């Protein structure tokens, strides 16, 4: 109801709830939502019958044990674990989905929960079940950089320009050979065009697809964004920087990783003290 009343129907690119705060302001959006909520509560019946409520009972499984692998997370319920799995680029193939289904189908109360960043959690696992799920998902992201996000890309999207999944795969393949420590390179966000499906503006490093004119003719390129943040209260929408040709971006990230590794640092600490070096590296790859 709030979007119907206040959403942008003139500009298709801004026909999203996230743009309502821009047009109404933070307080205005809260006020508009409360106004519509009040109307719905007066006009609709929200009374629930006890028979409609989901009856649940505590899940009982064997005593838990500690795990060293970061992808296994202890749940708040004693003895239960969640296993994080992110297919590279969020591309969960039908065969892999079937494999996961057949693996967890006999596991009592085990479920899959999806994340907004193309990953998933297999929850309510016992210790032994968590180990089985972990072994079955070794093809996914193994560190922060490999959890990077890419939109579906121009090979499928009719609007897109850049092939985001191909770029991400090339970057991960190149970076893996360097064996950087976890955290040396941040999670990146890649969109194939200005539609922002890869949410490049909120990425620590983001790339947005386009075309760059070169002496050899037009080539696929991605404009770089840096310093974005999606955390509540710390939100930053980054500005667009220069464009780097797509086939040079894996080398750019490898060189960046080597610079950071040389100082035995993680990206977030390094960039705060070495932003000028980061800009110099961008200039090198956009010259």
Give, region by region, the residue ranges found by the protein language model:
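Catalytic cores of large soluble enzymes that bind and process phosphate-bearing ligands
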Residues: 9, 18-25, 85-92, 125-126, ...
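Terminal amphipathic helices with adjacent charged low-complexity linkers/tails
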Residues: 7-70, 124-135, 284
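Small-residue-enriched alpha-helical segments and adjacent helix-cap loops
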Residues: 85-217
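Radical SAM enzyme core and accessory elements
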Residues: 268-287
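Mobile "lid/hinge" segments at catalytic clefts and subdomain interfaces of large enzymes
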Residues: 1-36, 206-265
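Short, flexible, solvent-exposed loop/turn segments with mixed acidic/basic and small polar residues
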Residues: 7-11, 71-77, 108-114
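Short glycine-/aliphatic-rich beta-strand segments at the starts of folded cytosolic domains
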Residues: 71-91
């Amino acid at each position: 109801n709030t979007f119907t009343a206040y959403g942008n129907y003139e500009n298709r690119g801004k026909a999203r709830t996230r743009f309502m705060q821009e047009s109404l302001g933070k307080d205005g959006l809260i006020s508009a939502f409360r106004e519509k909520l009040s109307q719905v509560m007066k006009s609709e019946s929200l009374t629930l019958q006890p028979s409609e409520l989901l009856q649940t009972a505590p899940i009982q499984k064997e005593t838990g044990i500690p795990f060293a692998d970061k992808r296994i997370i202890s749940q708040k319920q004693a003895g239960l674990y969640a296993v994080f799995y992110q297919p590279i680029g969020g591309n969960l193939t039908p065969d892999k989905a079937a494999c996961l289904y057949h693996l967890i189908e006999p596991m009592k109360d085990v479920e899959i929960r999806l994340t907004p960043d193309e990953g998933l959690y297999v929850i309510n696992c016992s210790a032994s079940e968590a180990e089985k799920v972990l072994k079955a998902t070794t093809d996914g992201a193994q560190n922060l950089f490999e959890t990077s996000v890419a939109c579906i890309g121009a090979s499928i999207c009719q609007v897109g320009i850049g092939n985001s999944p191909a770029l991400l795969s090339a970057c991960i393949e190149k970076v893996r050979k360097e064996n950087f420590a976890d955290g040396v390179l941040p999670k990146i966000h890649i969109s194939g065009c200005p539609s922002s499906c890869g949410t490049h503006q909120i990425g620590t490093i983001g790339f947005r697809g386009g075309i760059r004119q070169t002496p050899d003719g037009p080539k696929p390129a991605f404009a770089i964004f840096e310093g974005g943040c999606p955390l509540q209260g710390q939100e930053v929408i980054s500005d667009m920087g220069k464009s780097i040709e797509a086939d040079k971006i894996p080398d750019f990230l490898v060189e960046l990783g080597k610079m950071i590794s040389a100082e035995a640092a993680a990206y977030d600490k390094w960039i705060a003290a070495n932003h000028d070096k980061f800009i110099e590296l961008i200039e090198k790859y956009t010259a």
